[in-house]
């Protein structure tokens, strides 16, 4: 393969409003398999993934958590990277839309489009879905709700900048007609054509009501609408509009954008229209895959019907989960996740077919030939089908991967594995071993099995990157054997096998389903309790205040500027003790995210020291140090506390997931 042969593949950049679920893993594992396969073919691959970190939803989530938006997304992004490491995702670059170089590129793109007249200022009046970050007209709503997610929308009216999407309607239709591979699957293309023909509206590309975003450089009261920001990542990550990288000319245009069907419209209408306006090449293919369903509905963080991939990987192994996602879901259509389907796929394909074939073959090689078998001249008619299937496998898998029919590629590989298992039954090696005259024939049979396993292992490396090397090791081969140029029958002259652990231990279906059902019930109960607690809190907050004997004497009014000088933060109590010198005071040592400080507080009457240690509470942390107890102690702040109706004292504590040092607003 020549050095200039490149392949650029991208996942959507994920929205880090919460931890990712198995549906996100599905997209990323599919891209990873394609990237790995192209590398095996000798391509210079750029595999891009990342996170889309701006927008109203994250701004609101951060405010609820009492942290800045950047602090909020930093925490989630760390879990995203940990997940991809766990799942053996071999990405080459991870982009964050909060990266300085990306913001530089976006501002240059926005300015260029404005200066050439493709972006103009106006006013937006219509409807907005916060969950989908989408604007909608009256005619686009379905029963008054968002046509994408079915949730409530709210009326929006604000000054905004617009991109002239409608200007490019005819060019987009021509693009689809002249490049039938541009949108896949075919059914998705028909949806986009219908959307354009109903009248393509210009696109709102800025907000004044959302501050968490990339500022419009020539009008900083506006921030860029999230889709313009997010879509530009595919070229900013290569160095377009910035000096961070210099790979735009090498890798652009992208060979494949892989996205969920719910964001296909932005990638096949808005994105190519922007590129047309910038006079840049268009991506070669955009594939809109289906949803991973659970209990009849799309998995969604906001709905809560999600499956944690970390839990699945810990219990069943990473490659088992990768295989299930790639094999079980019809690529391009919706697929359903169930515990039963997962376990049955592991048992049937991985444990019974693949695992048993390897263990039986290795065991027979050791039993009958001391572990070493050689290529034997001549074959019999019964060998021909297995030889042919093994030699033709690379071509079939290559065609399937080029066509993005990933499940079919795995079916082809496992067809060889299943044929090899059948070949054992047909040739009956145990019977051949009873007669010394059949020794050469027995060796030929075992060699055929080793060859089928070797070729299957080479190709499985793209999908099961931990399993393929284990297969090679048991066949007595090293990592250099995983080479597609060697993926044909008869290449390896001999084998010296080494018995290893079972690749995929068989699962007791009844016991496992019972366990998973119990765990599901626990999670549902916890979710229901959390929902109920939230509803109670909202109900209590909305209820009219009861009469009380609280003292409503007010202090003198202070200015807003004076109040802004007060620094309020969440602190954790590291130590607490009573003072011998005072029955009223407790001596607290708290950590405010930067340092430990001492605070003396008159709450000893109501709180025991051991009840406060480890708790998170609010403090005023920029008070001037105050000497107390005749200078023996210095108090460096105050804690939040409230008088109760019965003359007692109450302290508001913060939850475990509230970061120490978070600002209190």
Spell out what each predicted region is.
Residues 76-92:
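A glycine-rich helix N-cap at a beta->alpha junction
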Residues 2-76, 95-110, 115, 132, ...:
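N-terminal catalytic cores of NTP/NDP-binding nucleotidyl/phosphoryl-transfer enzymes
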Residues 1-3, 37-44, 65, 69, ...:
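Secondary-structure transition/capping motifs at alpha-helix termini
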Residues 2-49, 101-105, 149, 155-367, ...:
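Structured secondary-structure scaffolds
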Residues 542-665:
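Phosphate-backbone binding interfaces of nucleic-acid-interacting proteins
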């Amino acid at each position: 393969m020549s050095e200039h042969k490149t392949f650029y593949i991208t996942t959507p950049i994920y929205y880090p409003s919460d931890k990712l679920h198995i549906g996100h893993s599905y997209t990323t594992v599919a891209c990873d398999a394609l990237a790995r396969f192209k590398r095996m073919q000798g391509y210079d691959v750029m595999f891009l993934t990342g996170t889309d970190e701006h927008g109203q939803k994250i701004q609101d989530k951060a405010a609820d958590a009492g942290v800045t938006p950047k602090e909020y997304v930093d925490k989630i992004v760390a879990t995203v990277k940990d997940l991809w490491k766990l799942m053996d995702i071999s990405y080459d670059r991870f982009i964050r839309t909060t990266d300085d170089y990306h913001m530089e590129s976006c501002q240059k793109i926005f300015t260029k489009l404005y200066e050439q007249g493709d972006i103009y200022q106006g006013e937006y009046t219509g409807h907005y879905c916060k969950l989908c970050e989408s604007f909608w007209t009256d005619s686009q709503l379905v029963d008054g709700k968002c046509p994408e997610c079915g949730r409530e929308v709210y009326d929006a009216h604000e000054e905004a900048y617009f991109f002239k999407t409608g200007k490019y309607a005819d060019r987009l239709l021509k693009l689809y007609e002249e490049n039938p591979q541009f949108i896949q699957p075919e059914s998705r293309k028909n949806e986009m054509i219908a959307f354009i023909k109903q009248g393509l509206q210009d696109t709102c590309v800025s907000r004044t009501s959302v501050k968490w975003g990339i500022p419009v450089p020539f009008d900083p009261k506006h921030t860029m609408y999230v889709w313009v920001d997010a879509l530009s990542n595919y070229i900013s990550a290569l160095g377009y509009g910035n000096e961070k990288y210099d790979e735009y000319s090498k890798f652009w245009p992208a060979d494949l954008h892989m996205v969920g069907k719910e964001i296909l419209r932005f990638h096949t209408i808005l994105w190519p229209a922007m590129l047309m306006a910038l006079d840049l090449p268009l991506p070669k293919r955009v594939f809109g895959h289906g949803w991973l369903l659970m209990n009849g509905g799309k998995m969604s963080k906001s709905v809560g019907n999600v499956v944690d991939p970390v839990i699945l990987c810990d219990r069943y192994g990473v490659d088992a989960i990768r295989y299930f996602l790639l094999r079980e879901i019809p690529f391009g259509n919706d697929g359903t996740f169930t515990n039963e389907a997962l376990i049955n796929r592991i048992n049937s394909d991985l444990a019974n077919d693949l695992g048993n074939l390897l263990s039986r073959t290795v065991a027979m090689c050791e039993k009958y030939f001391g572990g070493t078998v050689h290529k034997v001249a001549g074959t019999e008619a019964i060998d021909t089908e297995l030889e042919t299937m093994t030699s033709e496998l690379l071509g079939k898998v290559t065609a399937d991967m080029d066509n993005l029919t990933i499940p079919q590629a795995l079916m082809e590989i496992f067809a060889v594995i299943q044929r090899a298992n059948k070949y054992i039954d047909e040739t009956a090696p145990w019977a051949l071993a009873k007669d010394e005259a059949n020794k050469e024939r027995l060796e030929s049979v075992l060699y055929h099995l080793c060859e089928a396993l070797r070729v299957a292992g080479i190709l499985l490396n793209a999908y099961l990157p931990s399993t393929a090397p284990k297969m090679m090791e048991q066949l007595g081969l090293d990592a250099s054997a995983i080479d597609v140029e060697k993926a044909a029958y008869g290449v390896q002259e001999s084998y010296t096998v080494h018995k290893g652990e079972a690749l995929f231990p068989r699962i007791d279906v009844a016991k496992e389903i019972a366990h998973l059902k119990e765990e599901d019930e626990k999670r549902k109960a916890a979710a229901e309790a959390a929902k109920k607690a939230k509803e109670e809190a909202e109900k209590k907050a909305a209820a009219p205040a009861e009469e009380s004997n609280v003292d409503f004497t007010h202090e003198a009014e202070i200015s807003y500027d004076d109040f802004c000088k007060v620094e309020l933060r969440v602190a954790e109590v590291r130590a607490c003790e009573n003072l011998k010198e005072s029955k009223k005071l407790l001596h607290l040592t708290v950590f405010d995210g930067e340092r430990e400080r001492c605070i003396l507080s008159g709450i000893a009457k109501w709180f025991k020291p051991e009840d406060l240690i480890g708790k998170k509470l609010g403090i005023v942390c920029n008070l001037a140090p105050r000497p107390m107890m005749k200078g023996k102690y210095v108090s460096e702040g105050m804690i939040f506390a409230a008088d109760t109706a019965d003359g007692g004292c109450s302290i508001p504590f913060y939850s475990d997931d509230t970061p120490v040092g978070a600002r209190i607003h």
